[in-house]
């Protein structure tokens, strides 16, 4: 095994005059199956193509894109493992100081909107050479979409980038067919019948049979109700059984999304996972400090794809789909056994998971032939009676992994759906999880405690979490284990008022939880929650939703989740006053915060000093964030 060439010298050493494909990525080159670029490049290599990797090229000049010369078939472009704007900016739009997908965690090695920038550099260097885009950034931006950083609706990234074809979702099937047809002389711009792809065509061209139309780019840019309806239609057509082609007009062209690609079978998923990856970053990065993103996944196992949880704020369903596909035990055992021959392996498998760790089968029997339901979720607000809850196969897999010579411990660190676990009366899985697979803490994701907010999130109500907490504590006590359940929580999600944030603070106090880090809702492309953030409308119900968009209000909601910190007292008091919960300011056991001098002065009797207008002013109920000075007008 060896890394694919990332320099002209490495390509020449292989005896190649030119590459068939040059794969351009916004990440450093890490040859590991947790990284999308590694999967696609190794897949193409296994099919006989010569593939060079252009990782994090300079973006101020087209010089780097000519590093390998003109590829024989074309360029493949990805922004990297995550959206380049998410890689660069926090939820508060502040520039990040670190990039875990770059050598030495160094920020700034990829451009904003990397896919678009790379495509334009390629066009500048090579004119009309074929370009196919894919990866998460392209996949989630395939339709006209609200862009949080521009605070405006942008067109499909296919139109913006000037590429010939877009692959959405997990791209193995699509890439295999595209490469074969390109090798046969067909340009990708002419490929209009491949599932899991998007293309652009003139308005006069025929459209796919049974295609459905959503509102045009111009219309969704101008009217928020229209945007919300288009969002729902797009989300409803992402099932590989029932999904239809979706058409969206962009100026004088149609954007056409073909139906989703078929999921990989177990045999295909095994084959992809067992391609000859180096499972590490390229040695060129060693002197720069390596690539930090490898640390958590180097000795982890991914056993499934897809997620039928389908939370509204999560992009997994829009990218991987809701249908569960899994790898075989034999394949996973072979991968784990190979760990034991790695000199860096200390005997600990860090995780056995995927989008959701404890999903080993589709949620119900009908999905293979009828697809997943369009109008309801499997687990929220309550679990569908048709959902099959069975951890038998996962328990057996974990037992087999524990038995491998050289493996000391197998951890399951995250991605467990506790609501799914609560559908099974048998305690075997949770008991073995507690006994063997948790290192001190188990992290799960209730996200909030307010029923209204959880409904907008597409999550089960908090009583399910509290029932799981009691069950977890009972089993820990029985097993003699001192373990802790750590909840992931989110502030400022659409639907969350200041009173909801106070309710969440009281939930933390009740359960003696003090989170050191707080996650603010991040409006990323391709999710129903981002649609709510932009439009103030729930696309599933078309009902209005309160949206906390004012930066200061979001700060107050976030601060309430750390109400106990002395430095937060002034903000917590202000939040409680705004919420009409001054009963929680005081010295009693049920209070969240003690009054400070400013608060006491503001509450003096008339004639002894007036109230502080900052504390008594009522917020505008529909207040939205002020327009950003850096917003780009389209």
Walk through the language-model features, giving the residues of each.
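N-terminal [4Fe-4S]-dependent radical SAM core
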Residues: 1-18, 28, 225-300
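Glycine-rich beta-alpha loop elements in corrinoid/cobalamin-binding modules
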Residues: 10, 36, 55-250, 257
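Conserved SAM/AdoMet-binding glycine-rich loop
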Residues: 23, 58-59, 337-486, 490-494
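N-terminal pre-triad scaffold of radical SAM enzymes
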Residues: 24-29, 288-315, 340, 348
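Terminal amphipathic helices with adjacent charged low-complexity linkers/tails
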Residues: 60, 189-239, 252, 261-264, ...
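Flexible glycine/acidic-rich beta-alpha junction loops that bind and position SAM and/or redox cofactors
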Residues: 83-92, 140-142, 172-177, 201-206, ...
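Conserved, mostly hydrophobic/aromatic
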Residues: 164, 272, 307, 311, ...
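Acidic, low-complexity intrinsically disordered tails
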Residues: 376, 595-634
